[in-house]
Swiss-Prot record:
Stated role: Catalyzes the transfer of the diacylglyceryl group from phosphatidylglycerol to the sulfhydryl group of the N-terminal cysteine of a prolipoprotein, the first step in the formation of mature lipoproteins.
Name the record gives this protein: Phosphatidylglycerol--prolipoprotein diacylglyceryl transferase
Pathway(s) the chain acts in: Protein modification; lipoprotein biosynthesis (diacylglyceryl transfer)
Family stated for the protein in its record: Belongs to the Lgt family.
Amino acid sequence: MLPYPQIDPVALAIGPLKIHWYGLMYLIGIGGAWFLASRRLNRFDPTWTKEKLSDLIFWLSMGVIVGGRLGYVLFYDLPAYIANPTLIFEVWKGGMAFHGGFIGVMIAAWWFGRRNGKSFFQLMDFVAPMVPIGLGAGRIGNFINAELWGKPTDVPWAMIFPPFSDPAQLPRHPSQLYQFALEGVALFLILYIFSRKPRPTMAVSGMFALFYGIFRFVVEFVRVPDAQLGYLAFGWVTMGQILSLPMILGGLGLLWWAYNRPQPLKNTAL
């Protein structure tokens, strides 16, 4: 069994002001995405300036934050937020849903593309390889917060999370780290390598949706579902799996359509 590193969720306190690691992870993810996007900008569109890229990253970040929070409220704990709406603003305590953030990003990309002469999938293909940076950083934030841990296990790398998070004090799968490895590192490598060669429009987006959906669906088998939801069917189906299944099917559909519709191969290497 591995010891859980006792990390204070508050990274820095200045008087009454507290800066949480969870929030810093979002900043690291956004900064990392901007850095990679700036390195690939000329291959995407030589006419775009760094200022326009910064505008894109800003609106996508707003989509992630607003969509992620509203997605958690709607998909995972709507009754609690109806009873106490002020909880919606306590984002430092966690409670963000990737699938809601993904919808927020799609809306922001569609809106920004319309204003800047880019199609929805041109922007999504450009953005997709950057997303795992934010996903990986977010999972580290979950780990520091000692939230979203896995089921009890006797594997050598099991961890006992703090009593405030897990009163049962059982050795558990560190599922946040599994998701960091799959949704962060592995997905980044897949998309980075895949997007280095010219691909038809929608192909990179399809790869993102397919592999994120697969990775999330698999990890859900060892991750404890949110207590207020539990398992939704057959004693093992979780909300995360239900929301990931359309991504898997959608990713397959996008890849099939990208490579089978009648169009020339476009030089969209990123």
